[in-house]
Amino acid sequence: MIERFISEVPRRIWGEKAPHRSRFGEAEFNVASWIRFEHSRGPLKLMIHHEDEAGEHLEVVDSTGAPGDGNALLSGVVRVRFTGKVKAMRVLLGVSDPEVIWSVDELYVQRRGTPVARENKLISGF
């Protein structure tokens, strides 16, 4: 699977659940993205990637077979476990073929359990 960068997730979204005094932390995130694709020959995967003191981690949010040309809404809830200081969190698209042409129409990331407010979620129209 080839990983393609979609977006950084701002610290204001994941930072509250990152460990402070304890060494470990955990949080769940609602993630959704509307993806357009052309020339796909295999699956597409929406993924959350984060880096912490234990290394790099990758969680699959959702996937689709995605043959040919079209679009797909990929969405789900992902649980992220943090170890020590968190460096970054990103949204990635996994593609099986380097020839796939893709674009993101919309992206949504929100930590579960937070009040509905603009500062608590990443909503992007590309």
Annotate each PLM feature.
Residues 1-126:
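Extracellular and organelle-lumenal recognition/adhesion modules and their flexible linkers in secreted
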